[in-house]
Amino acid sequence: MLLQGTHRIGRMAMLLALADENESPVLSIPKGWKYCTGKVGSMNSQKVVAAMETAAKSNQVIETDVYRETHALYHAIMEALYGVTRGQIQLADVLRTVGLRFAIVRGTPYDGKKEGEWVAVALYGTIGAPVKGSEHEAIGLGINHI
């Protein structure tokens, strides 16, 4: 089981999330891999999770009727949110809001087929008090097997 150097799923997700709208990251997405990107802003962590899950389903990154795919995506999203929120996913309860760009990538990062598919979720943006100018940059990455 070797992680393929050209198939670093987390790195690809991070580069996609970090790219501004007017720039495209120089990436070679491996054949058969799927991804989507988007933006979400809220004081409600449930809305953040729902927006990313909806994007993944709408862009056929995960199958809507397969529970294990939704479950894997959920855990990758939560892991990425832990990074953005420094381990405390509360937002509105502690008067914090986020404005994030996200990328969700699905693929096979290992050289052995038995290792199966994985999903990576990258988040980049700002977190802070719900007052313009009172935020700072934050980043998070979550990776889970499907």
Curated annotation (Swiss-Prot):
Protein's GO biological process: L-histidine metabolic process; positive regulation of gene expression
Entry annotated with the keyword Aminoacyl-tRNA synthetase: no
Gene3D superfamilies for this protein: Hut operon regulatory protein HutP
Matching Pfam families: HutP
Top-level taxon in the UniProt lineage: Bacteria
GO molecular function annotation: mRNA binding
Keywords: Activator, Histidine metabolism, RNA-binding, Transcription, Transcription regulation
NCBIfam families on file: PRK03065.1
Subunit structure: Homohexamer.
Function: Antiterminator that binds to cis-acting regulatory sequences on the mRNA in the presence of histidine, thereby suppressing transcription termination and activating the hut operon for histidine utilization.
HAMAP family linked: HutP
Family under the similarity heading: Belongs to the HutP family.
Protein name per Swiss-Prot or TrEMBL: Hut operon positive regulatory protein
Species in which this protein is naturally found: Bacillus cereus (strain ATCC 14579 / DSM 31 / CCUG 7414 / JCM 2152 / NBRC 15305 / NCIMB 9373 / NCTC 2599 / NRRL B-3711)
